Amino acid sequence: MVRMDLSRIRNFSIIAHVDHGKSTLADRILELTHAVSDREMREQFLDSLELERERGITIKASAVRVTYRAKDGEEYVFHLIDTPGHVDFTYEVSRALAAVEGVLLVVDASQGVEAETLAKFYMALEHGHVIIPVINKIDLPNARPLEVALEVEEVLGLPADEAIFASGKTGEGVEEILEAIVQRIPPPKGDPEAPLKALIFDSVYDAYQGVIPYLRLFEGRVRPGDRIRIYSTGKEFTVDKVGVFTPQGLVATEALEAGEVGWLVAAIRDIHDVQVGDTITLADRPTPSPYPGFRPAKPVVFAGLYPVDSGDYGKLRDALEKLKLNDAALTFEPESSTALGFGFRCGFLGLLHAEIVQERLEREFGLSLIATAPSVVYKVRLKSGEEVEVHNPADLPDPTRIEEILEPYVKLTIFTPEEYVGSLMQLLQEKRGRLVNMNYLPGAQKRVELVYEAPFAEILYDFHDRLKSVSRGYASMDYEQAGYRPGDLVKVNVLVHGEVVDALTFIAHREKAYTMARAIVDKLAEVIPRQLFEVPIQAAIGGKIIARATVKALRKDVLAKCYGGDVTRKKKLLEKQKEGKKRLKAIGKVEVPQEAFLAVLSAGRDEPKG
């Protein structure tokens, strides 16, 4: 077997803000290294999910191996690990970054440095990587490459003269990028003779071969027939085959060695056995220490998912299990609701993640689902001294037992042109935000960096859309968790015909509870079909009703057959109708239709546009 020369390997990743042209640049790199023939080339080659290509975002990390003959005449092996760009997928990015030695930081020549660029940059710095700034999209008419290069130097401290000007669309400058990868990014270190130490940075599920973990080997080697052990669970498996990633798919090889990026098949049936971020080692010669710094992904947003047809409950469970194979951050547990039947309480990394999971369930598994309003995790300190976590607003303990409720806060970093600062500050004030820092950036395009702290729940719903509309699409944001703080929060129950609909319960700040409740009951009154009796819809905090709307009763015209005639006769018929309605009202049940749940999702969140 030919030994890989470590000095000829380069492992790198591309990081960028959403839409700065990362996937297009990756396409050009594949073309220039002749990894993909012109016939096979398609846009966003590495984005394998249909959804990724449709939305134009990268959701899962994926890897590819290409060879490049550099100007020095030597042939190098590049492992490119593509990373997601959206803030929800920060953990995926951190794992992909752990597997490489250097990164290309792509910045759009017309947009400049944006919030997520900054977040990703700090992550790469934490890993101690070599960072090559690439100013992309220089073919655009409104590109300002020099100015952006200076902005990169000012904001990120990367020397402007090291920046490479390129265009993923035309291919200009890509050759220069490939040379820079060879020159500037260090080769991997590692001893193939040492005990095996491999980091799992992703995994996919294959119906025939089970879970296929994607690995970066730091030490040792692995070949078919080896007995491997998963570090955190201690489970052992026998390797069937190992191999590398080519743009055409997975290709088996004889062995993988330190410094390489590849995959293995070992008949692993349960995804929980290979958590992303775990270390794989040999059963008979384990490595003394696993790869550091990994924590299981922690969901921060929870929502209930219920099948429209209750018969699909089992199908939904299987679908969630399958998605979890590829998505370490997704959690779910069964829950039941009087209004919606049986479903699951699912945990996500953020709203985009929740949306994508729901869309994949509906698309790939043909399910139709109802999602309840997403909520964050509250911590409740009880008078007894214990602390409980609340994932579902309906589970909030009785107010008499509560000492205080803590809500999660986030630290927001917002980049915006100067003229929108006023309206953005107004929006953030509305969302109970607190200004921490404000920073004017150099350059002709007067841009400002705002740093705010705000309750996560306020940012959850329509904040991103409102941010974009207030700033005409120019502002960008990134957030990170900033711990818990006490808040004046109340649980609001929604009652339809005197019965609490648990799926509509929400937790809100006391000042905002009335406005949100009002919007929700009005919306429900519009969408709940009229019954033969009057249906009151109420919102209550504890025993106190704070908002009410009524769905008027449908009335049959009982006087239609009385032509003229005595008034007492008419009265008798009307009284009889009234009696019947009273009886109906006492025993009548109101079905809350599906649209009602969907309507409520939008209702309580549309606060008056400032």
Swiss-Prot record:
Keywords linked to the UniProt accession: Cell inner membrane, Cell membrane, GTP-binding, Hydrolase, Membrane, Nucleotide-binding, Protein biosynthesis
Topology term for the membrane: Peripheral membrane protein
Enzyme class: hydrolase
Catalysis performed (reactions): GTP + H2O = GDP + phosphate + H(+)
Binding site for GTP: 19-24, 136-139
Enzyme Commission number(s): 3.6.5.n1
Source superkingdom: Bacteria
One annotated GO biological process: positive regulation of translation
Main location: membrane
Residues covered by the tr-type G domain: 7-189
GO cellular component: plasma membrane
Gene3D superfamilies linked to this entry: 3.30.70.240, Elongation factor 4, C-terminal domain (3.30.70.2570), Elongation Factor G (Translational Gtpase), domain 3 (3.30.70.870), P-loop containing nucleotide triphosphate hydrolases (3.40.50.300), Translation factors (2.40.30.10)
Listed InterPro entries: EF-4 (IPR006297), EFG_III/V (IPR035647), EFG_V-like (IPR000640), EFTu-like_2 (IPR004161), G_TR_CS (IPR031157), LepA_C_sf (IPR038363), LepA_CTD (IPR013842), LepA_IV (IPR035654)
Pfam families, per the entry: EFG_C, GTP_EFTU, GTP_EFTU_D2, LepA_C
Family note: Belongs to the TRAFAC class translation factor GTPase superfamily. Classic translation factor GTPase family. LepA subfamily.
UniProt function note: Required for accurate and efficient protein synthesis under certain stress conditions. May act as a fidelity factor of the translation reaction, by catalyzing a one-codon backward translocation of tRNAs on improperly translocated ribosomes. Back-translocation proceeds from a post-translocation (POST) complex to a pre-translocation (PRE) complex, thus giving elongation factor G a second chance to translocate the tRNAs correctly. Binds to ribosomes in a GTP-dependent manner.
NCBIfam families assigned: lepA (TIGR01393), small_GTP (TIGR00231)
UniProt-recorded name of the protein: Elongation factor 4
Organism encoding this protein: Thermus thermophilus (strain ATCC 27634 / DSM 579 / HB8)
